[in-house]
Regions:
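Catalytic core of carbohydrate-active enzymes
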Residues: 462-466, 470-473, 480-491, 504-508, ...
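Catalytic and substrate-binding clefts that recognize carbohydrates or anionic sugar/phosphate headgroups
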Residues: 34-35, 55, 76-265, 275-276, ...
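A low-complexity, Ser/Thr/Gly/Pro-enriched, surface-exposed linker/loop concept
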Residues: 2-24, 28, 43-85
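Solvent-exposed beta-strand/loop surfaces of large extracellular or lumenal domains
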Residues: 62-77, 653-671, 775-797
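Aromatic- and carboxylate-enriched substrate-binding clefts and catalytic-loop regions
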Residues: 4, 55-57, 64-67, 297-573, ...
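Conserved, mostly hydrophobic/aromatic
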Residues: 42, 196, 291, 331, ...
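Catalytic domains of carbohydrate-active enzymes, especially glycoside hydrolases
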Residues: 283-303
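Short, well-ordered beta-strand segments enriched in hydrophobic/aromatic residues
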Residues: 42, 52, 88-93, 629-632, ...
């Protein structure tokens, strides 16, 4: 294990909380107080969003951050009250209370609920570090923030964590690393850092984003069960409080601040296949044939580092891939896209134009002595781009032309923590300098380490937009910081082909979802080590419900394409991937919701049921949207597992068995039939069977419903699947509801919003569990059902933009 993993904060001094404060300025949005030479600002950005900044002596307030996307907030109605003991800053939704002696800050909503209140004893402040290196002065002193834990407060979030949903009683480290292959759930910091806590107290939620890109640590009621601690090794204290009170409102406002997930190209939601590495053109063609001949849907094939010339980025190995343009064109005709890996390390080679151009333009990181910083990764000795420099990002993005001109559809950013090969130095040393270019100030690597991956992903996305302005970019990143979701989807790095890692994937993706990163996925089947048929099949049963579905494994392991282990596993993988392909209309509609509101796609049960404390520990089951509940098998040789179904009526997808929640059940989940449940009366839009997203079968869209007494709703969203016409209204969005009484069922398709017109002519309603019907009307006119068989009533409707009402007399 490298020194980076074991590193603990060394303050070398004493913590000093801020003392007596005095008001010295205020405006129509916030107030400023001074404690000696330190300035503290409290600002209302929105009725339910406050920002607090603590800036040391001589430091002007600065809030620019790679983690923040929105800086221009609309007018907020704010009132300030002042007394000798306290200042209050109130909006229509919440109040910030600023006690002056000593300075302590807390928040309360309009109902009086208190949250994010400073610890009375420790508050916030800094650690004096005498004898600091002059070169390190820009880093500043370590800073600390202590918050009181409310009675019953439970902590969640914290980004990419694998050890479970709840974080109460834990210590969290935020420092991006390339962890050792085979890490377990107890391993703390991984590839990305999102210093955001999501708290629930008595069913009410709030969030706290500690926006500091140095190494950060949280203690969430571990050392002291009555307080939480947020600290960084340098910089200022800047944090944002999201008042809630629902999880949906917290995540909505958090992603408004840090950035929404862009609408993806539709093809990126299809099944994807990767290996480190498909070594040459013929091997790639063989894999493509395997999918099409076996009838297993697939949209994307990846090229790992062996497509390059000596691992040099933005090159092709002419021996392995003599004509990449022709290969990619041929694959495109078969319905495949190709995505290529790109690492940040640039080989130091005088005969390599990418390296020499970057050197001539002074675009690389430096040593503290001003020399070009070098270290070792895949190509050997490398230089590392300074992605804090806008000129570097533009140059990097333009270099992608070598790939896009050959037809490459997306960029896979790897090794961007950044990871290094030299023993005991797993990433750039703290004193490496990022010059920042002509428009930026130089920064030490310690100041920006956690943002390096996000900045690389930003360069990739901006480059693709410049090279192909009419296409939605597809960028994958392994590393990043809060807000990475606006640049790329987050692949969670090198897992292992272990049952434990299958289980760890579920809390990992749910934690990311609560932290704003909804578009994420793990390697299906596991990356490190040999998988087996049962593990691959069970992992596929889980993987097809991820927002990102990709099978990937490392060099030297057994092949793990869906057919690698023969029957019955090939058939299980085929049918599960076919189910994902059919669910794409539902999945794409969830991406629309996520793009507009930040709502997670794969979400923990507590997101929808925060007042149900049983959901707080439901680590190994999850919701896809609010309609499907998935509970995968995560142990070998078993067919039964415990499932918790929250409030409402739920139906087993395969058998139609009905359950009234909240209820604990023992679910039967034989291989090929995972524990999958559908919320009653909630329509699921499903497409026809297809080999890839570009295939357009004649079969109509199906709205699948398991009717149950009461009312359920969902949304169907469609657009061209690529391009940016949807931003100009070229989309089709409609609400669909189902309402059931004792003898009556009503399906309503709301008016189609937007100017996009779907190509299909028909929509099919499939009402499962309906065995008899006395009559069917469509907009008050009698309508003969297609059939009542197999435990389902099927009704075919014309595709119309106007509202449609279907009545079924039971």
């Amino acid at each position: 294990m490298s020194e980076t993993f074991e590193k603990q904060p060394e303050t070398g001094g004493d913590y000093e909380p801020l003392g007596v404060a005095e008001l010295f300025d205020h405006d129509d949005r916030g107030l400023r107080v001074r404690v000696g030479a330190t300035t503290v600002e409290v600002t209302a950005l929105a009725p339910d969003l406050f920002r607090v900044g603590m800036f040391p002596a001589g430091g002007p307030p600065r809030y620019d951050s790679e983690g923040v996307a929105k800086e221009d907030w609309g007018t907020v109605e704010v009132s300030m009250q002042e007394s000798d003991e306290e200042l209050t800053l109130s909006t229509t939704a919440a109040t910030a209370r600023v006690a002056l002696n000593p300075l302590r800050i807390g928040f309360a909503d309009s109902s009086g609920r208190e949250f994010a209140v400073d610890d009375e004893e420790l508050g916030m402040g800094s650690v004096e570090t005498p004898g600091a290196d002059v070169f390190s002065e820009p880093l500043g002193s370590p800073v600390r923030l202590y918050k009181r834990r409310e009675a019953g407060e439970r902590y969640f979030g914290c980004g990419e964590r694998t050890s479970g949903l709840e974080k109460t009683g834990s210590h969290q480290v935020f420092y991006n690393v390339d962890p050792p292959l085979g890490h377990t759930a107890s391993f703390n910091n991984l590839y990305s850092s999102i210093p955001f806590t999501f708290s629930i107290t008595n069913g009410k939620a709030h969030g706290l984003f500690f926006d500091n890109t140095h190494r950060v640590e949280f203690d969430l009621a571990l050392e002291d069960e009555n307080r939480a601690y947020y600290g960084a090794e340098g910089g200022a204290i800047v944090y944002y409080v999201f008042c809630g009170p629902t999880p949906r409102e917290v995540v909505d406002r958090y992603t408004e601040l840090t950035g929404r997930t862009p609408m993806p190209p539709l093809w990126t939601l299809g099944n994807q296949q990767c290996r480190y590495s498909y070594m040459n053109e013929e091997e790639v063609r063989e894999v493509a044939r395997g999918f099409r001949e076996r009838g297993i849907p697939c949209d994307v094939i990846y090229l790992d580092i062996h497509y390059m010339d000596g691992y040099r980025v933005f090159t092709w190995n002419e021996d392995r891939f003599p004509n990449p343009r022709r290969l990619i064109s041929d694959l495109r005709e078969q319905g495949f896209r190709v995505v290529t890996i790109v690492d940040p390390g640039v080989k130091v080679d005088e005969n390599y134009s990418v390296y020499t151009e970057g050197r001539e333009r002074d675009l690389y990181c430096k040593t503290r002595e001003g020399e070009e910083y070098h270290n070792v990764v895949w190509p050997g000795v490398c230089a590392f781009p300074d992605f804090t420099n806008p000129e570097t990002r533009g140059w990097w993005g333009e270099n992608q032309r070598v790939l896009t001109d050959a037809g490459v559809a997306g960029i896979w950013c790897d090794m961007n923590e950044p990871a290094l090969f030299i023993p005991h130095v797993s990433t750039l040393p703290d004193d490496v300098v990022h010059p920042g270019g002509r428009t930026g100030a130089p920064k030490r690597h310690a100041q920006i380490h956690n943002t390096y991956g996000s900045l690389m992903a930003r360069a990739a996305r901006e480059g693709l937009l410049a090279l192909r302005p009419d296409e939605r970019p597809f960028v994958i990143t392994r590393a990043g910081y809060a807000g990475l979701q606006r640049h790329a989807m987050h692949w969670t790095g090198d897992n292992s082909s272990w049952w434990e890692h299958l289980w760890m994937s579920m809390p990992q993706l749910q934690n990311l979802a609560l932290s704003g990163v909804a578009w994420a996925g793990v390697d299906v089947g596991g990356f490190g080590g040999d998988t087996n048929g049962e593990l691959l099949a069970r992992w596929t049963e889980f993987g097809v419900f991820q927002p990102y579905c990709r099978n990937h494994t490392t060099i030297g392991t057994r092949r793990q394409e869906p057919w690698a282990f023969g029957e019955p596993y090939e058939s299980v993988c085929r049918e599960m991937i076919k189910l994902r392909q059919r669910l794409l209309p539902y999945l794409y509609s969830l991406f629309d919701e996520c793009h507009r509101t930040g709502a997670p796609i794969l979400r923990p049960l507590l997101f929808e049921y925060p007042e149900d404390e049983t959901t707080y520990t439901a680590d190994d089951e999850f919701l896809l949207g609010d309609v499907l509940l998935v509970a995968p098998i995560t142990r070998p040789g078993i067919e039964y597992r415990h499932v918790y179904l929250p409030e409402g009526t739920w139906f087993h997808y395969y058998s139609g068995e009905r359950f009234e929640g909240p209820v604990h059940i023992l679910a039967h989940a034989p291989l090929g039939e995972p524990a999958l449940y559908v919320r009653g009366s909630s329509p699921i839009p499903m497409g026809p069977h297809a080999a890839h997203t570009g295939e357009r079968p004649d079969d109509p869209l199906t709205l699948l419903v398991y009717p149950a007494k009461g009312k359920g709703e969902s949304t169907l969203y469609e657009d061209a699947g690529n391009g940016f016409g949807y931003e100009e209204g070229e989309y089709a969005r409609r609400r669909i509801s189902c309402e059931v009484s004792d003898d009556h069922l009503t399906i309503r398709l709301g008016e189609r919003q937007g100017s996009f017109v779907p190509e299909r002519q028909e929509i099919r309603l499939e009402l499962r569990g309906i065995t008899t019907a006395q009559g069917v009307t469509v907009n008050d006119e009698e309508h003969a059902p297609d059939r009542v068989e197999g435990g389902a009533l099927t009704v075919t409707l014309g595709e119309e933009a106007t509202p449609t009402r279907v009545e079924v007399i039971l």
